[in-house]
């Protein structure tokens, strides 16, 4: 049936022929058909061009030929409004992406948004394509673009537990306090102590509360009875007197769960009774004054190594 239909529809026959050539990596046939006038920008029922097809399949040489013959990488498909660069990001095709990013269309595709507002960086972070994330940032992709739901690539990397992508994005100054401190609160809620420590070391604000209820990370630690998170948060400057929208401090939240002795409750009672020592107050203030972007430059400060280690919390028993 298909063969009979193809004989009656030369255009469909050509489309299937060049798609088969791309799938097989037959660059000779691809080039020959293009030179005979076949358009690289024709679209199938899903809105895919041959550039979408070859990028998704990982056919680098075909991508190069299509670009040489006028393929347009700004075209979005009908599935989700994705460009060929989005599909390259999805499959981690960094070399193919470089070809497109080195073209005249770079500025039009590097931050192109899908129907849901996802850029190629969102896609790469979601799928954990760390080399692709590096490539996009090398070409100056916007590091904190917002999707239609207000989500950044860093948030997607956190939610999907793409640790390498998280570190790369933070190294490129992604906003660690996005959505009023979402990242640190998420790490606390998930009891992900390694993420919690990483965000704190990089200067995440310990006292930002959720917009809906005012719960800070320390409140959430109390709710989860997570004494390790509570200790880390306190050491990095969490305020034990901050109140949520119901007027509760973290200690009050902990007591409301159960008045009996528990590790987190005992800890919060202890630190709430005793003021911080001057040394710790100075450390908190110095880190705040240095600022988020400069914390990674602590090693360059003209101070003793023991002081640098102290500012980095290397002596904390957590």
From Swiss-Prot:
Q: PANTHER family in the record, alphabetically? A: ANKYRIN REPEAT AND SOCS BOX CONTAINING 7, ANKYRIN REPEAT CONTAINING
Q: Which Gene3D superfamilies match?
A: Ankyrin repeat-containing domain, SOCS box
Q: Which family does it belong to?
A: Belongs to the ankyrin SOCS box (ASB) family.
Q: Which cellular components does GO assign to this protein?
A: cytosol
Alphabetical GO biological process terms: intracellular signal transduction; protein ubiquitination
Provide the species name: Homo sapiens (Human)
The residue ranges of the SOCS box domain are 265-318
Return the protein name. Answer: Ankyrin repeat and SOCS box protein 7
